[in-house]
């Protein structure tokens, strides 16, 4: 059986470590490369020393040297992703991207790169969250115009971007279902809104603390009842396994920009 050769950027990070394990243990994939910065003290060290599931022949290697991989996975910060994306295009290697906190210029780069290679970009790779995106759209279309919508998210103290990419994806899914322009209806700071809540708005609340992997709740509140749709992740392996699934799906796909909804056939 031919296995998909996976290369992981940011292999020494929290998500990178989970991706190394997932790539090493899934039946149809194998960890072919674990990339770190050229200044990393891990450079040249056998990955198996830190992750017993990894093949003993794989060492941490310089992210500038991409060889012998079928697909690349990147969950690093935006600055790193930009460099890695250029490398992937130059080498003609498909790429799975889970980086959050991207700006408009970054999204333009993604779209341009997708003219040359197949890319899966998703803010969350868990199956549950992607099912949630469908559920919130259904809920948004079933309630009347007097519905109030709020999104709450919680993550570990180290997460930089806020609201999370997943929270924004939930809000955008709801706005799309309602026919709203998300940028015009999103409210991120109510302390400066000196008036009652408008019905045509989506509010965001954020918590950062401890080691929370990720929690998201969409509230649909109207007079006399409230619907709460919640997803809680207890392990980063949830996202890592989803990314490995996306990587296997992406191989041999034509150039283009895909998302996890495509991978799971939820569209």
Swiss-Prot record:
Residues binding NADP(+): 37
Pfam family of the protein (one): DapB_C
Keyword Oxidoreductase: yes
GO cellular component: cytosol
UniProt-annotated binding residues for (S)-2,3,4,5-tetrahydrodipicolinate: 156, 165-166
Compartment(s): Cytoplasm
Pathway(s) it belongs to: Amino-acid biosynthesis; L-lysine biosynthesis via DAP pathway; (S)-tetrahydrodipicolinate from L-aspartate: step 4/4
Enzyme Commission number(s) of this protein: 1.17.1.8
CDD domains (alphabetical): DHDPR_N
Catalytically driven reaction(s): (S)-2,3,4,5-tetrahydrodipicolinate + NAD(+) + H2O = (2S,4S)-4-hydroxy-2,3,4,5-tetrahydrodipicolinate + NADH + H(+); (S)-2,3,4,5-tetrahydrodipicolinate + NADP(+) + H2O = (2S,4S)-4-hydroxy-2,3,4,5-tetrahydrodipicolinate + NADPH + H(+)
Family: Belongs to the DapB family.
NCBIfam families: dapB
The name this protein goes by in its record: 4-hydroxy-tetrahydrodipicolinate reductase
Species the sequence originates in: Pseudoalteromonas translucida (strain TAC 125)
Lineage summary: Bacteria, Pseudomonadati, Pseudomonadota, Gammaproteobacteria, Alteromonadales
Gene: dapB
């Amino acid at each position: 059986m031919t296995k998909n050769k996976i290369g992981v950027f940011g292999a020494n990070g929290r998500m990178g470590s989970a991706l190394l394990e997932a790539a090493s243990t899934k039946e149809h994939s194998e960890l072919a490369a674990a990339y770190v910065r050229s200044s990393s003290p891990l450079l040249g060290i056998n990955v198996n020393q830190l992750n017993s599931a990894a093949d003993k022949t794989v060492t941490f290697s310089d992210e500038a040297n991409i060889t012998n991989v079928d697909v690349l996975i990147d969950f690093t910060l935006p600055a790193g992703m930009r460099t890695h994306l250029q490398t992937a295009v130059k080498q003609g290697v498909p790429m799975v991207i889970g980086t959050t906190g991207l700006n408009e210029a970054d999204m333009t780069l993604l779209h341009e790169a997708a003219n040359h290679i197949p890319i899966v970009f998703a803010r969350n790779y868990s199956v549950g969250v992607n099912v949630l995106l469908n559920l919130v759209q259904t809920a948004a279309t079933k309630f009347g115009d007097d519905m109030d919508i709020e999104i709450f998210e919680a993550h570990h103290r180290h997460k930089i971007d806020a609201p999370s990419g997943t929270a924004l994806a939930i809000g955008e899914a709801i706005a799309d279902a309602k026919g709203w322009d998300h940028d015009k209806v999103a409210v991120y700071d109510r302390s400066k809104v000196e008036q009652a809540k408008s019905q045509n708005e989506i509010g965001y609340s954020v918590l950062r603390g401890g080691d929370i992997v990720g929690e998201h709740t969409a509230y649909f509140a109207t007079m006399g009842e409230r619907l709460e749709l919640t997803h809680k992740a207890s392990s980063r392996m949830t996202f890592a396994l989803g990314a490995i699934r996306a990587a296997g799906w992406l191989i041999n796909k034509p150039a283009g920009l895909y998302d996890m909804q495509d991978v799971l056939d939820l569209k």
